UniProtKB/Swiss-Prot annotation:
UniProt name for this protein: Tryptophan--tRNA ligase
Catalysis: reaction(s): tRNA(Trp) + L-tryptophan + ATP = L-tryptophyl-tRNA(Trp) + AMP + diphosphate + H(+)
Protein's organism: Ureaplasma parvum serovar 3 (strain ATCC 700970)
Gene from which the chain derives: trpS
Record has 4Fe-4S as a keyword: no
GO biological process, one term: tryptophanyl-tRNA aminoacylation
Gene3D superfamilies: HUPs, Tyrosyl-Transfer RNA Synthetase
SUPFAM superfamilies for this protein: Nucleotidylyl transferase
Cellular-component GO terms for this entry: cytosol
Motif 'HIGH' region in this chain: 10-18
Family to which the UniProt record says this protein belongs: Belongs to the class-I aminoacyl-tRNA synthetase family.
HAMAP family (alphabetical): Trp_tRNA_synth_B (MF_00140_B)
Amino acid sequence: MKRLISGIQPTNNLTLGNYLGAIKNFVDLQDDYEVFLFVADLHSLTPNIFDNTDFSTTKRQIIATYLAAGIDPKKTCLFYQSDILSIPLLAHILLCSTSIGELTRMTQFKDKSIKATKMANNTEMIPSGLLTYPTLMAADILTFNADVVPVGQDQKQHLELTRTLADRFNKRYGNTFKLPQVYIPKIGAKIMDLLDPNIKMSKSSKNLKGVIFLNDSKDIIFKKIKGALTDNLNKVKYDLTLQPGVSNLMTIYACLTNLSFKEIELKYQQQNYGVFKNDLANIVADFLEKLQQKISYWLNSPELDIMIDNSCERANDIAYQNVQLVLKHMQLK
């Protein structure tokens, strides 16, 4: 069975985009892959504005959300990134074989560097962790020698660098790493902001009215969906070019009902946007209410911490063996 790995940062609240773009897919994939899911707490340090307020609680809630969504701890290994000390060790090894040019070419680094603030000495405050983020991500993947990595389009370039680094290591020190393949779901891989369908729905959005959080109440969900940007065509049709707002709402609808875009179009061909939005709001609200109840169960269950400890032990054993092999091939061991 091939191995799949992915992580999510424990910052603020998870969104419906996080669920539909990642968590839901993990649930579907765990029957076909050996799945490793981690809370990427080390990546949370990247912006250099780390807020540790209730951080341990937030991390725990991420695991509870995975379980509530249907992740089976017997099939999937759930752990905290910071508990696996082999990861930062491998990250340093990979960093030493990565050029500055490779890191500065990363699109995310370029985009976020533009927003950097000027300091008193006229230099820009660009955290070094932002530059080295891709090598830590590569270590996350290669520490477990994963075959498959589900990533959004915004992370695809980082995975390509991971493959490059793995191949470079193999050629220099001998066959050690697999070259991980990208997995991008056809539907729901990227849920967009309700108010601006040109940007991804994000928990760090400046306007939270365009973001549905997993802990939103029914009233808030209805307000956000009713206020979602559409167009003046008043026709429920999937067209990313002419109707990006409606297409985004249809993607959410399709992911939660398993209906195709064509089936949704036929269902609402005689209906206006008001009816469509009301139905979608009910679907989202009903789904999140059930999910919230399951999350609450896990947060209050002593089984949660026992499960995390057991999964962490398993992850550490695998990571240690893999990185020890790396050290051996480099003759550092």
